[in-house]
């Protein structure tokens, strides 16, 4: 498929490729073909040094995370896998979200696990001000989490 070729060729020229499967699914019905999914996944797994899987606490995202984690357990993957939980809410409910996330991904023995909090106030302020998180709220939880990940990745 042309999309798989594009991704494979791009992988030689860039450090990161981010693919939103939700957008791909709805943008081109022909991409729902199982052969395309298999070719796509095989191509990504062959060239990726690091594979980051993003998931939110939402039901659809949690289901997809369980499915992909199960599929990965049956495959040989060259790169390191990092799982990232996004939109974790603070407090007891957030602890429950994180616990569910960890119960799904921990058996896979990933390279790293990351958690990004839900920080609507900071994101809304940055959006409204058309600024970056650092400028809108330098002490926000999301900005601090992103800074910690960036620091870890650059050391």
Task: Go through each PLM region and give its residues.
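Nucleotide-state-sensitive switch-loop elements of NTP-binding domains
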Residues: 1
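Conserved catalytic-core segment of NTP-binding enzymes
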Residues: 5, 9-111
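Beta-strand-loop-alpha "switch" segments that mediate conformational coupling across diverse proteins
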Residues: 87-92, 103-134, 146
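C-terminal interaction surface of TIR/SEFIR-family domains
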Residues: 139-141
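C-terminal alpha-helix
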Residues: 145-155
């Amino acid at each position: 498929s042309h999309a798989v070729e594009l991704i494979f060729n791009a992988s030689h020229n860039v450090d990161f490729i981010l693919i939103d499967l939700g957008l791909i699914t709805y943008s081109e019905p022909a991409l729902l073909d199982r052969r395309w999914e298999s070719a796509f996944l095989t191509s990504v797994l062959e060239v990726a040094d690091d594979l980051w899987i993003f998931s939110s606490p939402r039901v659809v995202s949690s289901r997809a995370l369980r499915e992909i984690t199960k599929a990965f357990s049956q495959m040989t993957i060259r790169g390191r896998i990092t799982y990232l939980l996004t939109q974790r809410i603070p407090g007891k409910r957030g602890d429950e979200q994180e616990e569910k996330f960890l119960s799904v991904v921990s058996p896979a023995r990933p390279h790293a696990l990351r958690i990004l909090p839900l920080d609507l106030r900071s994101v809304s302020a940055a959006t409204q001000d058309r600024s970056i998180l650092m400028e809108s709220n330098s002490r926000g939880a999301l900005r601090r989490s992103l800074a910690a990940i960036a620091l870890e990745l650059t050391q």
